[in-house]
Amino acid sequence: MEITNVNEYEAIAKQKLPKMVYDYYASGAEDQWTLAENRNAFSRILFRPRILIDVTNIDMTTTILGFKISMPIMIAPTAMQKMAHPEGEYATARAASAAGTIMTLSSWATSSVEEVASTGPGIRFFQLYVYKDRNVVAQLVRRAERAGFKAIALTVDTPRLGRREADIKNRFVLPPFLTLKNFEGIDLGKMDKANDSGLSSYVAGQIDRSLSWKDVAWLQTITSLPILVKGVITAEDARLAVQHGAAGIIVSNHGARQLDYVPATIMALEEVVKAAQGRIPVFLDGGVRRGTDVFKALALGAAGVFIGRPVVFSLAAEGEAGVKKVLQMMRDEFELTMALSGCRSLKEISRSHIAADWDGPSSRAVARL
């Protein structure tokens, strides 16, 4: 049976993967209200397509932090991809390069920055948590720089891990044959005592709860790489990110895995975009499963989107070929949405191309009986 959309990959992944692994990737925090809402909120935004526009040629290319990519759809950091497929992050990196887009590598990857770099050329970002031992952070950043990574995506919504009840029930641990490769060959100081199977829980325990804006400033003193602040969902924090020299913002609720009952990212996006005032680009992750979702995010002011779970599920289903297919499907759907909305380039996508549930009656056509 031919796979025709991204959602079908999740069903295949659920069949193929051990329950503990599938649940780790698929679940969210506590009641999982935000997990469902990340998806559902997109359905409360409708299109206002413009017609009789020559859409023979559609240009989806864009420039992110100075790097030209083929489309505004990029790969979000997801941990431990070798649980999904033996090739893990290698496969994802190759698929991203083939699609001409950006891959973000998780610090908690089962392949190291050097291994991912060895797959060949590509524009790659490195996701970073800040640990209690700043020396560990500095070593990770150095390695990412040396491996040719182009930006740091600093995760700021995780002073502690969210309560993911599926993982508690399943007693989630990283399978014994896998390890968090970015922590190999790093002087972990006190962290050395942990064996591999305990390393993932130990590393999680080393995330610094005292992380604050001053650490964003500190990070800029140890690296010249641009820093994207990942996990902003309010105007207040968007303004602070701009003030503290962030190169960009990723509107993210960590795939609904941290604090439940935060808004869907697509609901928080416009507030953040307005607060950033065009001074730095704003990106979105969370719940993007269709090309229509990508268009809606761009219409609300996003410079691009990142996809996470679709990558992991397609990787589990079909390895590198699966990830390539997901990127191609999203690209094709997005191109079709642009054509049917009368937009020939990303700069033509505007707020007037959508009507959201929260818009006032003045901005929405009132149906006459």
From Swiss-Prot:
Catalytic activity: glycolate + O2 = glyoxylate + H2O2; a (2S)-2-hydroxycarboxylate + O2 = a 2-oxocarboxylate + H2O2
Any one Gene Ontology BP term: oxidative photosynthetic carbon pathway
Organism: Spinacia oleracea (Spinach)
UniProt effect for mutating residue 108 to S: 100-fold decrease in affinity for glycolate and 500-fold decrease in activity
A single cellular component GO annotation: peroxisome
Pfam families to which the protein is assigned, alphabetical: FMN_dh
Swiss-Prot/TrEMBL keywords: Acetylation, Flavoprotein, FMN, Glycolate pathway, Oxidoreductase, Peroxisome, Photorespiration
Family: Belongs to the FMN-dependent alpha-hydroxy acid dehydrogenase family.
Protein name: Glycolate oxidase
Highest classification ranks of the organism: Eukaryota, Viridiplantae, Streptophyta, Embryophyta, Tracheophyta
Domain FMN hydroxy acid dehydrogenase: 1-359
Binding site for FMN: 77-79, 106, 127-129, 155, 230, 252, 285-289, 308-309
Function comment: Catalyzes the oxidation of glycolate to glyoxylate, with a reduction of O2 to H2O2. Is a key enzyme in photorespiration in green plants. To a lesser extent, is also able to use L-lactate and 2-hydroxbyutanoate as substrate in vitro, but shows almost no activity with L-mandelate.
EC number of the protein: 1.1.3.15
Note on cofactor: Binds 1 FMN per subunit.
Main localization category: other
